[in-house]
Each structure stands twice: as C-alpha cells, then as structure tokens.
Amino acid sequence: MEEGKGTEKKGCIITVIIVCIVLTVGLDIVAGFVGLQAQAAQQYVKHDKLECKAPSKTAFVLGIIAVSCLATAHVSANVIGCSISNLFQALGALPKNKITTYFNMACLFLIWVVGIFGALILANGIWSNTESRIRCRFTNNHVFSIGGKVCFLHAIVSGIYYISSIVARARHFHRTKPNKTKPSELKPIPTEPNEAEPNSTPNP
C-alpha cells in the first residue's frame, strides 16, 4: 500500500512538471507571435522622417505583453529545471556522466543568454514606441521581429534542456533501481550436518 501511494504521488508530481513545461514553452511561443504582431502594428504608422517611424500605441502594448510572457517563461524554466533536479535527487537518480552534466549546464547558460538578449531587444522596441520621446531617431525597424524570433529560440532551448534533463536522470534511475525479491522467492540455504564431536569424557 505504501509503495502504491508513493508511486502515485511521484506520478502526480511528474505530470505537474510536464504540464508546467508545456505552459512555459507555450508562453515563449505566445511571446514570439505577439512580438511579430507588434512589428506588424509598427509598420502601419506613418513616416515622420526617413527610416524613422512615429510611435505606435498598439506596438507599445504588444511589446509589453511579449516581454512579460518571455520573463514569465524564463522564470518558469529555471524553477522547473530546479524542480526536476530535486525530484530525481529525491528518487536517488543523479546522473554520474560528466558529459550529460556539462550539456545541461550549457543549455541552462543558453537559456539565460537568450532570455536576457530577447528581453533587451523587446525593451528597445517598447522604448522606441513610447509617446514621451522628444524626437524620432534613426532606429532599426525590425526590432520586434528579431525579439519574436529570439522568443522562439528561447522556447527551443528550454525544450532541449527539459528533455535532456528528464531523459538522462530517468535512464540513470532505471539502471540503478534495485531489484526487489519477494520473501516467497527466497530459497533456503542448505546447511551441512555437523560432524559428531568426539566424547571427551572418559568412560567409567
């Protein structure tokens, strides 16, 4: 009964982690599409000067939504990554392969780099569409488009990080899982009969 409850509890935890992973990757995808929509909204505003567009309120709002989704997905990626490590550590499944460990660390590093880079690009696009700008400057008209593509890249890197972490630890867990034998399957060990000890007491 206790083993069944423990297995059911572990299954529920793994299911929750999988749902959170899907939501995290989904937030990255939503951020990418919103960034592309912000780029499309910015293209509709009229030119004030050459290669310089007027601020777009729609692009400004969509940019805020995109960077919010990216930030939420980034925080969730790190929290879920730590949860996966803690879960398999509790189950006694920590991979001893250094290559797998280095690969996971590289993916985590890429998640931070891509997340920060995407947030900075989207923030630049948001700033370029603020109504409080004193003058229109020469800016890149494809900022939101680049930011949206970076959000898609963040989703891909996060997915690779999750899959590599789960597969490596689950494989190690199955290899190191002890084989439990039932008491009925245990065979008695045959014992050799003890030799008769010589009688040390003299006969009367």
Swiss-Prot record:
Q: Where in the cell is it found?
A: Endoplasmic reticulum membrane
| Keyword hit for Glycoprotein | yes
Name the source's superkingdom: Eukaryota
Asked if Zinc is a keyword of the record, the answer is no
| Chief site of localization | endoplasmic reticulum
**Any one GO CC term of the record:** endoplasmic reticulum membrane
Q: Which UniProt keywords apply?
A: Developmental protein, Endoplasmic reticulum, Glycoprotein, Membrane, Signal, Transmembrane, Transmembrane helix
Any Pfam family hit: DUF1218
Region Disordered: start and end of each range?
A: 177-204
| Topology within the bilayer | Multi-pass membrane protein
**Residue ranges crossing the lipid bilayer per the database entry:** 13-33, 60-80, 107-127, 143-163
* Family statement drawn from the similarity comment of this UniProt entry: Belongs to the DESIGUAL family.
* Protein name (database record): Protein DESIGUAL 4
Q: Which organism is it from?
A: Arabidopsis thaliana (Mouse-ear cress)
